[in-house]
Amino acid sequence: MSQSQVPSRAGHYNMTALANALPQANYRQAPWNNGSQMRYNPAGASPNVVGQTQSSPQYNGQPGMGSMPNQGYYMPQQQQQQQQMPQYYGGPMSPSQPQPNMSSRPNVPFYGNQVMSNHQAHPSMGYYYAQVPAYALQGHPPHQAPVDSQSNVVRGPPRKPRQSGHAIWIGNLPSQTDLMSLVHHVCREAQGLESLFLISKSNCAFANFRDEASCLTAQQKLHESKFQSVRLVSRLRKNTVEGASGITAPTGPSATTPQQAVAPEVKEIEQIDSTETQSDNADTDTPTAVGTPDAKGPAVVDAAQKDRFFVLKSLTVEDLDLSVRTGIWATQSHNEEALNSAFKNAENVYLVFSANKSGEYFGYARMVSTINEDPAAAIEFAPKAQSVNEVDLPREIPTEPTKFTPKGRIIDDSARGTIFWEIAREDSSEGVTQEEPAPAVAEQDDTTGGLDGNSENKTWGKPFKLEWLSTTRLPFYRCRGLRNPWNSNREVKIARDGTELEPSVGRRLIGLFNRSHNSPGPRGPMMGMGQMMSPSQQQMPMGYPPPYS
């Protein structure tokens, strides 16, 4: 509406001055519009805006601007039905031109001439550029591993630091603590550090020293020492936990019979013990910090103790599924002697399995053979091949000596959140001792990272046969209140790989599995069958009464 058409008003209702102050704007159709779409063309807008190319004058007397040689055109939506995002095309293009075939380059936007520095020499050429997705609908298709990429071999046990027998717990660490920064700090304060295991999510660490004297000295010097902007807390790692009444709860099975009363509930005095009770740490297979491993079985097996129970950890649920199909398992080297001894002296050895960070027990099985010592029978660990996107095997990073810190190496097992440093030993070439588990992967060249395909990253485990009795999942919260007197009277969910359960506690835990049959069925395969077995078909351990409350 022009100004002359505005009716004259008097007084406060005269809006002529306001109308003159407002900018004038016109609506025009696009030059190639088929009549179904309008363009809003404000006055004074830049002619280079995509979709606003003007070939006719906007104001009277203004000459036509003509076509812009470097102007990009926006395709209407009705021409984009087979494309995931709008594409921009450089150079003058009419709507009658056939649409270029972009099917061979999905998700790659096309930039016109305006992105080239010398567009005069290339009046109608465009380049493809790989670009980060700019729209929600645009994006690279998710990486889907081929069906045959699922490995039929388990990944093997995790790496653990050397256990000297003299360890301290270091707490109150800052968040995002760097491992080597802490190692350098400990070595500056005290001598004799053998290994240091960092637990980032608990803001604490375990440090092993070569002897008792250096361990005591380090504990005194590290306590209240300033690290970055905080004061550290250090305590000796003990094998026993003393209760409020002065009664010491054993950390391993004693020579007493299972019929004896369970020690009263103890009060945890170490901060790490309180952090271990959290659910997010309960299913993590943290290394044993003390040098003398927790006793996994009684020195003398009582004649009445015909059943033994152990908790075994797995790196992944897939490894357990494979064991269900094959009936074979392999454990860490420091567990082999205890399992073999239990199999020879007890009538039944029951193994309760849990995958790390799963928050539940996978199931339980019965050991039906001793561990095979024949090297030819060893089973392969770790996937046969690793792609670039699946670099989750443990890495070994050497560290050079400094003024205070000796030469060592970092073991980074990011797949399970494990990282530690240990000193380099001169006798490492003589072989791995019984206390030190075999490496989970072969040595890798840092330049190739083991990804060149010429060599396979593998290690070997000693297998034994087992019979799966149940793969009914048992969440940890259903075991609340069930404590193991052979593990400092902690809850059964807090256990390392190879922890033995007191027989009466083991029977109760298996009873919880059988009570879970009324709950929704297991999510994984069972005994190699394509379908789940009904609760009535589940086998109950021989001689056990029905589940009880």
UniProtKB/Swiss-Prot annotation:
GO terms for cellular component: nucleoplasm. Transmembrane segments: none annotated. It comes from the Eukaryota. Residues 307-513 form the YTH domain. PROSITE patterns: YTH. GO terms for biological process: mRNA splicing, via spliceosome; regulation of alternative mRNA splicing, via spliceosome. Pfam families: YTH. Residues 29-102, 139-165, 243-262, 273-298, 425-458 are annotated as: Disordered. Gene3D superfamilies: 3.30.70.330, ph1033 like domains (3.10.590.10). Disruption phenotype: Significantly shortens the half-life time of the APHA mRNA and decreases the APHA protein expression. Residues 49-61, 251-260, 273-289 have a biased composition (Polar residues). Belongs to the YTHDF family. YTHDF1 subfamily. Specifically recognizes and binds N6-methyladenosine (m6A)-containing mRNAs, and regulates their stability. M6A is a modification present at internal sites of mRNAs and some non-coding RNAs and plays a role in mRNA stability and processing. Directly interacts with the acid phosphatase APHA mRNA to increase its stability. This is YTH domain-containing family protein 1. It comes from Cryphonectria parasitica (strain ATCC 38755 / EP155). The gene is YTH1.
